[in-house]
């Protein structure tokens, strides 16, 4: 980037836009196109792999023959590695360049995914998942950096739209894809799927991303100690939060140890930063109104995704439905993605404020949750088709608008003027993305469990011995199962179990209604945060116009 942006605080938005238009290529060529395709595939691949792992966790545990408690660490091994490598990618990317990191990481990731289904040893499986997380975790922070520096401004809205659609679509298409693999091929394909896609990404990166300039031999090598403290601390906190519900939170010594150790390492990273600042990290650059608010909105958006990740699958799963039966309900969220992406990109290019696009998306998601709050235990996947279409449009608009605001914030805050600024910017949002997704899922699981206990207790108050309604139901059910019971006593016990299962089913249904209402109110809160965002000085249409008229201005000056 031209050095003229370095003092961006003294420049007007017009000067920043002109310098940005000068530094970014005005014409798209084969190399940037392949590079952009590669990083978009990489961003979607990370999300798809994590989602497929969570869906196929039961099959993976059965394959290894591990217990429930040991199997719970498999998902944490992959996701904690993602969290660890996110901040550390700032150091690696600044030291070696994105091309080297992505090619090496994608190659190791491909080999790891190819051999993962063939591993039968629990310890080796955990180690392989950690390697897969460490390698795939480099994809997301480096993608935004490359796209911002190489895509012509008139194509930037469509790139953002496709980028958001790939990430969002991977979440919603995973249940149907995994169900199809499981029914027609094998559960092994939840890893082999990624092993086939990653080489395509490598080809695009190899031909599309230029090599980073050689580092000066006499230049001092930045210290990695602060990055190590920060990454390890975040990974420990992430693991503690993800395992907190299973370990019973502060009543568990393991949870307490992970939480305190993670907090201590974060404190060490802060002290290290204050005593000896690292040239590759620009934490003060993040302290801006819109950057902080956009981080909060990304966290909030990840929580609203629990509607399609947790609420809808579990509301159908209580009937014993398999992944291929649940998938059709969720895949309707992914059906309109390409059309919505093209429409959103066109609107952004026509000077639509991305805040309005994001607000429209959150509004659609909130209305869809209100419609889903009419759920009953008689619902099947078909009952969700219409609301999931609305949810798909809402998620796409909200995420595209959010990423659009993030990119504009990165440009007009001067992020492109220094590599360490944009790397820090990308790593910050990568960390928020992971923490938001996990914290939202953990909180929703805890919320549903607590609400189910409450509703079970309240419903149970109306089922008492001596009540003529209860006695009548017990007698009718006992008579119905008597023919297949060993006697009157056994029939009565089975009747009592049936009434108990009915109560639990209704309690779960009521807890899901509470969950839908919670997500709807979360969308309202997101709309309030969106209203607090400051308008960007210029929009994508203005940036496009700057780049189109740049040659004429340069000729006039000459």
Positions of predicted regions on the chain:
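Transmembrane core module of solute transporters
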Residues: 30-81, 85, 276-408
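Helix-loop-helix hairpins in multi-pass membrane proteins, especially solute transporters
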Residues: 86-226
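Hydrophobic transmembrane-helix bundles of small-molecule transporters
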Residues: 179-297
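Intracellular juxtamembrane helix-capping segments at the cytosolic ends
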Residues: 138-151, 397-414
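Residue-level signature of the transmembrane alpha-helical cores
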Residues: 42, 102-108, 112, 128, ...
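Cytosolic juxtamembrane N-terminal segment immediately preceding the first transmembrane helix
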Residues: 1-48, 62
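Interfacial helix-cap and linker-helix signal at transmembrane-aqueous boundaries
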Residues: 60-61, 92-93, 177-185, 316-317, ...
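Hydrophobic transmembrane architecture of multi-pass small-molecule transporters
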Residues: 18, 412-416, 428-558
């Amino acid at each position: 980037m031209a050095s003229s942006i370095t003092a961006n605080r003294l420049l007007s938005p017009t000067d920043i836009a002109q310098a940005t238009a000068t530094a970014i290529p005005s014409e798209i060529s084969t190399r940037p196109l392949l590079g952009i395709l590669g990083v978009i595939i990489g961003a979607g691949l990370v999300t798809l792999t994590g989602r497929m792992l969570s869906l196929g966790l039961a099959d993976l545990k059965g394959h290894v023959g591990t217990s429930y408690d040991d199997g719970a660490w498999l998902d944490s091994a992959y996701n904690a590695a993602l969290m660890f490598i996110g901040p550390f990618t700032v150091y690696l990317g600044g030291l070696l360049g994105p091309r080297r990191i992505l090619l090496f990481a994608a190659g190791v990731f491909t080999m790891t995914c190819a051999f993962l289904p063939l591993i039968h040893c629990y310890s080796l499986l955990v180690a392989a998942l950690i390697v897969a997380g460490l390698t795939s975790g480099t994809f997301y922070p480096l993608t935004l950096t490359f796209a911002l520096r190489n895509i012509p401004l008139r194509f930037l809205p469509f790139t953002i739209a496709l980028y958001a659609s790939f990430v969002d679509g991977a979440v919603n298409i995973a249940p149907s894809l995994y169900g199809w693999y499981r029914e027609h091929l094998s559960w092994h394909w939840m890893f082999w799927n990624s092993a086939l896609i990653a080489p395509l990404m490598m080809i695009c990166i190899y031909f599309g991303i230029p090599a980073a300039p050689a580092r000066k031999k006499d230049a001092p090598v930045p210290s990695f100690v602060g990055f190590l403290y920060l990454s390890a601390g975040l990974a420990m906190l992430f693991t503690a939060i993800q395992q907190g519900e299973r370990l019973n939170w502060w009543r568990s010594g393991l949870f307490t140890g992970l939480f305190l150790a993670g907090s201590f390492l974060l404190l060490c990273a802060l002290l290290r930063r204050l005593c000896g600042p690292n040239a590759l990290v620009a934490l003060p650059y993040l302290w801006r109104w819109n950057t902080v608010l956009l981080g909060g909105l990304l966290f909030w958006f990840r929580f609203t995704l629990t509607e399609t990740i947790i609420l809808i699958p579990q509301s159908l799963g209580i009937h014993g439905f398999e992944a291929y039966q649940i998938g059709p309900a969720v895949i309707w969220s992914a059906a309109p993605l390409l059309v919505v992406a093209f429409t959103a990109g066109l609107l952004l290019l026509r000077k639509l404020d991305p805040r309005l696009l994001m607000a429209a998306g959150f509004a659609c998601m909130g209305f869809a949750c209100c419609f889903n709050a009419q759920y009953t235990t008689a619902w099947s996947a078909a009952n969700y088709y219409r609301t999931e279409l609305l949810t798909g449009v809402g998620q796409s608009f909200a995420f595209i608008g959010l990423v659009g605001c993030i990119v504009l914030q990165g440009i007009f805050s001067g992020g492109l003027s220094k590599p360490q600024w944009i790397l820090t910017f990308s790593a910050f949002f990568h960390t928020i993305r992971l923490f938001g997704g996990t914290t939202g899922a953990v909180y929703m699981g805890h919320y549903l469990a607590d609400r189910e206990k409450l509703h079970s207790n309240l419903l149970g108050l109306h089922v008492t011995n001596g009540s003529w309604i209860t006695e009548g139901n017990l007698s009718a059910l006992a008579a119905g199962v008597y023919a297949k019971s060993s006697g009157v006593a056994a029939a009565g016990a089975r009747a009592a179990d049936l009434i108990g299962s009915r109560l639990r089913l209704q309690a779960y249904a009521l807890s899901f209604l509470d969950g839908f209402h919670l997500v709807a109110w979360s969308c309202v809160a997101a709309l309030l945060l969106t209203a607090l965002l400051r308008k960007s000085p210029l929009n994508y249409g203005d940036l496009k116009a700057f780049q189109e008229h740049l040659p004429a201005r340069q000729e006039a000056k000459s």
